[in-house]
Amino acid sequence: MERCDGVMFAARYDPEDGKRESVSEDTESERESESGSESESESEKETESESEKETESESESETGNTGKTGETRKSIGLESVSDSDSDSGSQSRSDSDVEMKEVDASNSNIVSDSSKHKSVLKKLRTSLSAQKAENSTSNSDSDESSVPTHDLAPLPQPALPRDQRLTATTNHIGNLDWLATPIYASTTETVPFSSFGLSSSMVKNLQSNGFSSAFSVQVSVLKLLLPDMESQAIRPDIGGDLLVNAATGSGKTLGYAIPIIESLRNRIVPRVRAIVLVPTKPLISQVKATFAMLSKNTNLSVVSLRSDISINDEAQRLQVVPDIIVSTPGRLVEHLTNGHINLKSLRYLVIDEADRLLNQSFQNWCETLMSRIDSNPISELDQTWRPSVQKLVFSATLTTDAGRLSMLKLQRPRLIIVNDRHELVNELFTVPATLQEYKLSLGSARSSAKPLVLAKFLMSEQKLVNTLVFAKSNEASLRLCRLLQLLFRVFGLDVTVSYLNSTNNAASTRAKILKDFANQTVHILVVTDLIARGIDIATITNVINYDLPNSSRDYVHRVGRTARANQDGEAYTMCFGKGETKWFTQLVREVSRQTEVKDVEKGFRDLVSREDEAKYDTCLEELQRQVFEGV
C-alpha cells in the first residue's frame, strides 16, 4: 500500500485501476517538476501545499459526514492486501461488494479533486508568466533610459503640397483686382445727352420725354460702354463686363438702355441680342416702356415675358424673333428649357436689381443661363473676332461677395461706384444724395397708440400728400390703412388712404392704384416690402417706415422710392423703445450717405393730446365692429 499527499491507492485489481494510476502518475510528475524547478520561490511552494490541503479537506468532506466511510476505505485496503485470495462466506462477499462500490465512488471523487488541482496550478503558471513579462518590460524601459538625451529642436519638415494651393489662391485674388480698384463717380455730375455723340433719333426721343441731361450714373456708364461699342466694331473681344453700384432712382435703366439701342439700331436680321432680367412684374413693365420709348423710329422689337401670361401664348409671340427681351429669371428659364429662345446671337445680358436676383434661385436660373450661353463651343480665332456676351450688372445694394459674383462668370469686369465717399465694403449700400433722413423715437409704452402717433405726425408736419408708408406685412398694412381712414375722418380731414400688397396685386388693380397715387387722387399709400421695388413714381416726396425694415438692404430700397432723379425727398423712421432705436442705429451705419440721420425733436405729448386718445379709442371700437360684421 502506498500513500501520496493523503490519497491511498490499493493494489487490488479494479476496472478503474488504470485511470487511478494515470491520475496518480500525473499528480506525482507535476509535483516532481515543481519541486525540481530552481526558479520557483518559497512562496510558490507554500501556495501549492495550501492548495493540496484544500483539496484533501474537500475530498474528506465529500466521502462522508461522520468519517466512517474513510475508516471503511482503510479496512477495505487492508483486507485487499492480506486476504486477496480467500473468501470468508456469503456475508463477507456481500460486504465486499458494498465496499467495492464505495471504493469506486471514492475513486471518482479523487479524479475530480485532481482536475481542480490542475486548474489551480494552471492559474499559478499564468500568474508567473505575467510576472516574467512585466519584469522583461521594466528591463526594456531601463535600456531605453540609458539612451543619451538631447535638447528639444524642431523636426525637419518636408515640402508641403499646400504651397501650390497658396499660389493658386493668390492668382485668384489677382483676378479680383477690379474690386479693389473701382471707378468712383460723383453723385452731382450731369452732362447733356447731346455731347455723347448719340444718334439724332435717340436725342430726339430723350428730349421729347423730358431728358436733356444725363445724371451721374448715366454719365459714367455711357463713357465706358459707348467707346466699347465703337471698338467692338473692329475688335469684338475688346471691352469687358460692367458692374454698377448706384442709389435707387438714379436713372440706371436709361444708363443701360441707351447704349444697347445705339448698338443694335443698325442690325439687319432680327435675333435675340439683348436680355434684361428684373425681379418683379412691375419692373418688367417699366423697363419695357423705357426701351419702347428710346427705340422709336427704329426697327428694333421689344418683348416682355411674365408669369401671368400663358407660356404657350408667349411662345407664339416669340416665333416673330424679338431683338430685346425683358423678363423675370424664372420665366426665361422656362422658355429656354422648352427651346423657344435661341441665344447664339446674344450680345448683352443685363441684370437689374442684381442683389435680389443673386440671392434667390428662380429655378437655378443663373447656372442654367450661363451654361446655355457657354454651350456654343467656339475656337480661339472665333473668340477674337466674334462678339462675346457682355454682362451689365446694376444694383443699389451691389454685393462684392466673390462667391456670388463668380456665378456670373464675369470677363474683364469693371466696377463703377456712384458715391462721393471713396470706400468699398462687402455690401455697397447707398441712398440718394438729395435724401434727408429722420428718426422719430418714443417710449415703448406708446407703441399701443402707434397709428395715432403716425396720423398726428403727418398732420403736424403737413405730410398728407405724396406719402408712402411701409408696413411689415399684409395684415399690418390693411389694419393701418383702415385706422388712418377712420382717424382722418374723425379729425375732419379729407385725406384718401389706400394700400397695395400681395392681396390686391393684380395687374389692373395695381396699375389703377399707382396711377391714382401719382395723380394725387390717393394721398397716402400703405405698402409692404414685396411691392416696394416696383414703384417708380417721381412725385413721391415722403417715405415713412411705420415698421422697421429687416435689413440695411430693405431700408435702402424703401427710402429709395423718394428723392429720385436728383429730386428732394425725406424719409422718416418710427422707433418705439430702446430696442428698436438700437437696431435702427446699427442698421443705418452700414449705409453710405451724404448727410447724417437727424432726430425729430418731438415727444408723445407734443403730438397726442388726451382728446386725441379718446378719439383713437372710438376708432378702434369702430374697426372692431367692422371686422366682426365683415364690413
Swiss-Prot record:
Enzyme class: hydrolase
Reactions the enzyme catalyzes: ATP + H2O = ADP + phosphate + H(+)
Chain location of the short sequence motif Q motif per the record: 191-219
Ranges in coiled-coil conformation: none
Positions with biased composition (Acidic residues): 24-41
Domain Helicase C-terminal per the UniProt entry, residue ranges: 459-608
Region of interest (Disordered), ranges: 1-161
Short sequence motif DEAD box: positions: 352-355
Subcellular locations according to the entry: Nucleus, Nucleolus
Matching InterPro entries: DEAD/DEAH_box_helicase_dom, Helicase_ATP-bd, Helicase_C-like, P-loop_NTPase, RNA-helicase_DEAD-box_CS
UniProt record, GO biological process: maturation of 5.8S rRNA from tricistronic rRNA transcript (SSU-rRNA, 5.8S rRNA, LSU-rRNA); maturation of LSU-rRNA from tricistronic rRNA transcript (SSU-rRNA, 5.8S rRNA, LSU-rRNA)
Secretion signal span: none
Binding residue positions for ATP: 246-253
Record keywords: ATP-binding, Helicase, Hydrolase, Nucleotide-binding, Nucleus, Ribosome biogenesis, RNA-binding, rRNA processing
Annotated EC: 3.6.4.13
Residue stretches making up the Helicase ATP-binding domain: 233-416
GO MF terms held by the record: ATP binding; ATP hydrolysis activity; RNA binding; RNA helicase activity
Annotated Gene Ontology cellular component terms: nucleolus; preribosome, large subunit precursor
Purpose of the protein: ATP-binding RNA helicase involved in the biogenesis of 60S ribosomal subunits and is required for the normal formation of 25S and 5.8S rRNAs.
Subunit structure of this chain's protein: Associated with pre-ribosomal particles.
Record remark: domains: The Q motif is unique to and characteristic of the DEAD box family of RNA helicases and controls ATP binding and hydrolysis.
Family: Belongs to the DEAD box helicase family. DDX51/DBP6 subfamily.
Protein name from the UniProt record: ATP-dependent RNA helicase DBP6
